[in-house]
Amino acid sequence: MRRLYKELENYGKSDFYPFHMPGHKRNKACIEGDFPIERDITEIDGFDDLHHSEGILLEAQNALSRMYGTRKSFFSVNGSTAGILTAISASVKKGGQILVARNCHKAVYHAIYLRELDPTYIYPQSDNDLGINGSISVSRVERYLEENPKIEAVLITSPTYDGVVSDVRQIAEAAHKHGIPLIVDEAHGAHFRFSDYFPVSAADLGADVVIQSFHKTLPAMTQTAVLHLCSERVSEKLIRRFLGIYETS
């Protein structure tokens, strides 16, 4: 990321006149204040293509993967929404069945609608003292999977908006026992890996796909998110295909 930022900074200071998008032409007079508009560019020589990364963006994503200890990591410029849509689409065939935590983000419901899925909902436990939804019960996950062998993936949100973390390791083991992947919406937990004071990231607990919103808890601009592919239970080829569909082209 340091190299990418430096290259953008250097290009912004150059005297190249941009006969390309975006329409502001890197002209700082277009916007009041100190917004670094000169670093806002399109796919030009030296800056790679996010959907077919071979250079500086591939290098940055590989560095991200090493930092989080994943099989592959991908940037999402459409927030965690694109990551969630991608993860579900790559894990469950159109019209298939999925086990979903009822307190999930609306992007999950959008994926269910778009892919015409048949969802089974698992409700979180209640924390009556705090008046909020609690974690997802491992035993309930196991029961639903035993009762319905046609379920193709499990999806939970951990941490929730209230900071509740489920037992990802045990839920992952339950899913894997039935030969299916666990998708974790970890949008609010991108910071977990950087301190022992935080819970352990789902990427380190056996989840197969983990989606994080860097802009929620890390110093990143709005919409910045990542999708971590952590195992071979979900096709990398399908992840790449659906990211290309759901992200801006």
Task: State where each predicted segment sits.
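N-terminal "arm"/small-domain region of PLP-dependent enzymes with the aminotransferase-like
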Residues: M1-G55
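Conserved PLP-enzyme active-site core in the AAT-like
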Residues: L4-Y11, C30-G33, M67-T70, S80-S249
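Conserved N-terminal alpha-helix of the aminotransferase class I/II PLP-enzyme fold
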Residues: P36-G79, N103
